[in-house]
Amino acid sequence: MKPLEIDVFLCRSDNFGVLLHDPESGATAAIDAPEEGPILRALDGHGWKLTHIFTTHHHQDHVEANLVLKDKFRCEVHGPYDEAIAIPGLDRSQADGDEFEFAGRRVQVIATPGHTAGHICYYLPDDGLLFAADTLFAMGCGRLFERPAADMWHSFQKLMALPDDTRVYFGHEYTLSNARFALTVDPDNAVLRERAARVETARQANEFTIPTTIGLEKQTNPYMRVADAGIRRHLGLEGAADADVFAEIRTRKDNF
């Protein structure tokens, strides 16, 4: 089985468009559909035909092009069961623990409520790929619009249980801001400082910072490091529950 091909490009202002292509079957999935034009140009540039859309949550900047792409390609739209009514063109709803096939490969659904109530991630265990959209960012997490911090912390624990070498594709190019914020709560983390410097250089050159890995996030993402003594001491939360430390970090980011 040949490796999947992945193309990443910008949509709107900072959304990532992601296409996942199987060179043997020709199957091509879009991870969300933020904007019609960039997706069509990417497909045309490769000579790919869209067969699937894997929707992660209902926000407009992730579903805007669902209907026009479905009308053009007759592709199959997957999306979260708990947000089914809000997903344009939905064909198959997916709940936590569901599994389906894409081009003969297993796709596992992980419910990650927090950013929205029904947000899901798509995990391809045999390929070591996680499509996390607006749950997990490089050195960050999604803003909590519909569920409390405790729910997002539970979602993060699910993702932290994946293999460290899992490649993570996220939904927005927020990495520079995330890195700068992470340094304010984890200033003594040498790995974080080195990564933040690399990100500064990459973004100055207009280079993307995607993908990341679960292992790298465990080392540098403050939301995954809530048990770290240095972070807790810096926040004045030495004896707090993990979920409370997570919530404090998210609150500080909201005001950063």
UniProtKB/Swiss-Prot annotation:
Keywords: Hydrolase, Metal-binding, Zinc. It catalyses: an S-(2-hydroxyacyl)glutathione + H2O = a 2-hydroxy carboxylate + glutathione + H(+). Its cofactor is Zn(2+). Zn(2+) 2 binds at residues 61-62, 134, 172. Transmembrane segments: none annotated. It is an enzyme of class 3 (hydrolase). InterPro entries: Clx_II_MBL, Glyoxalase_II_hydrolase, HAGH_C, Hydroxyacylglutathione_Hdrlase, Metallo-B-lactamas, RibonucZ/Hydroxyglut_hydro. Pathway: Secondary metabolite metabolism; methylglyoxal degradation; (R)-lactate from methylglyoxal: step 2/2. GO terms for biological process: methylglyoxal catabolic process to D-lactate via S-lactoyl-glutathione. Zn(2+) 1 binds at residues 57, 59, 115, 134. GO terms for molecular function: hydroxyacylglutathione hydrolase activity; metal ion binding. Its EC number is 3.1.2.6. Binds 2 Zn(2+) ions per subunit. It comes from the Bacteria. Monomer. Belongs to the metallo-beta-lactamase superfamily. Glyoxalase II family. This is Hydroxyacylglutathione hydrolase. It comes from Agrobacterium fabrum (strain C58 / ATCC 33970).
